């Protein structure tokens, strides 16, 4: 189950942080590390700071885009320390651990951490189902990347241990939720349809698509429900083409 939980680092700029993150992960039983467009490649410093977790570094998936790292996941949680102009469903670290373990029984889960200095962009955060914030000391809330990973990884492990200690058998059944890939295709289809009907203007969608993303993220439609929505969009497109042909 824990292998289904991906720790995703976006544009990490210091190899030492990669090593420290690998160490934080392995102490909690996590080994699935993804590096998105790292500004530097793992090197001897990363191996040194991994302190026995060099296998996590050696087996890390290095990809060019966040979409590649999220492919195949049904749940994505992004870390965010800043308040956003567009509110998003929030979790605390404990809730994040519980939800991640519950969903990782069936499909991959991604826990996404941003750049050392500026974190994740708004666009990247909008690809997440939830945001998680660590309730650090407001007078000094500066956690480095490995510290943040350690906090979240600890809560994941505690949630996983609870299922083991209670003797709970996790049912491995097909998740009813769509994968991130399916959701992104839906958002693309939705934007295309809204453009075709004139509801939004090309190059000037305003906040409409952002707010619609938030709406569907909050509602979190199941796979069958998403298929219904895609069918509605296809019907609107067909009707719109018919009107133009007349």
Curated annotation (Swiss-Prot):
One Pfam family this sequence matches: SpoU_methylase
Phenotype upon changing residue 23 to A: Loss of activity
Coiled coil spans: none
Subcellular location per the Swiss-Prot or TrEMBL entry: Cytoplasm
Binding-site residues, S-adenosyl-L-methionine: 79-81, 114, 134, 141-143
EC number: 2.1.1.200
GO CC term, one of those recorded: cytosol
Mutagenesis / variant outcome for changing residue 84 to A: Loss of tRNA binding affinity. Loss of activity
Outcome after substituting residue 199 to A: Strong decrease in activity
Effect in UniProt of substituting residue 140 to F: Strong decrease in activity
UniProtKB keywords: Cytoplasm, Methyltransferase, S-adenosyl-L-methionine, Transferase, tRNA processing
Gene3D superfamilies xref list: 1.10.8.590, 3.40.1280.10
Record-level GO BP terms: tRNA nucleoside ribose methylation
Phenotype upon changing residue 175 to A: No change in activity
Domain-related comment: Both the catalytic N-terminal domain and the extensional C-terminal domain play key roles in tRNA binding and methylation.
Subunit structure comment from the entry: Homodimer.
Purpose: Catalyzes the formation of 2'O-methylated cytidine (Cm32) or 2'O-methylated uridine (Um32) at position 32 in tRNA. Can also methylate adenosine or guanosine, even though these nucleosides are rare or absent at position 32 in the anticodon loop of tRNA.
Family of the protein in this entry: Belongs to the class IV-like SAM-binding methyltransferase superfamily. RNA methyltransferase TrmH family.
PANTHER family, alphabetized: TRNA (CYTIDINE_URIDINE-2'-O-)-METHYLTRANSFERASE TRMJ, TRNA/RRNA METHYLTRANSFERASE
UniProt cross-references to NCBIfam families, sorted A to Z: PRK15114.1, rRNA_methyl_1
Protein name per its UniProtKB record: tRNA (cytidine/uridine-2'-O-)-methyltransferase TrmJ
Organism name: Escherichia coli (strain K12)
């Amino acid at each position: 189950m824990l292998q289904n939980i991906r720790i995703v680092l976006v544009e990490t700029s210091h190899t030492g942080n990669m090593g420290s993150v690998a160490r934080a992960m392995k102490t909690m039983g996590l080994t699935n590390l993804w590096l998105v467009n790292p500004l530097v490649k793992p090197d001897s410093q990363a191996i040194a700071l991994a302190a026995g977790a060099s296998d996590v570094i050696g087996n890390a998936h290095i990809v060019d885009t966040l979409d590649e790292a999220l492919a195949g996941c049904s749940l994505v949680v992004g870390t965010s320390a800043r308040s956003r102009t567009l509110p998003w469903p929030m979790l605390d670290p404990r809730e994040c651990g519980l939800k991640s373990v519950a969903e990782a029984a069936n499909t991959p889960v991604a826990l996404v951490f941003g750049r050392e200095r500026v974190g994740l962009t708004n666009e990247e955060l909008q690809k997440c189902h939830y945001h998680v914030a660590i309730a650090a000391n407001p007078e000094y809330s500066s956690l480095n990347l490995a510290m943040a990973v350690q906090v979240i990884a600890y809560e994941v492990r505690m949630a996983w241990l609870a299922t083991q200690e209670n003797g709970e058998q996790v049912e491995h059944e097909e998740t009813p939720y769509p994968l991130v890939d399916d959701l992104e295709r839906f958002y693309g289809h939705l934007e295309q349809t809204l453009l075709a009907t004139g509801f939004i203007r090309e190059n000037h969608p305003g906040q409409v698509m952002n707010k619609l993303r938030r709406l569907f993220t909050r509602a979190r439609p199941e796979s069958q429900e998403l298929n219904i929505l895609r069918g509605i969009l296809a019907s609107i497109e067909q009707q719109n083409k018919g009107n133009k042909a007349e």
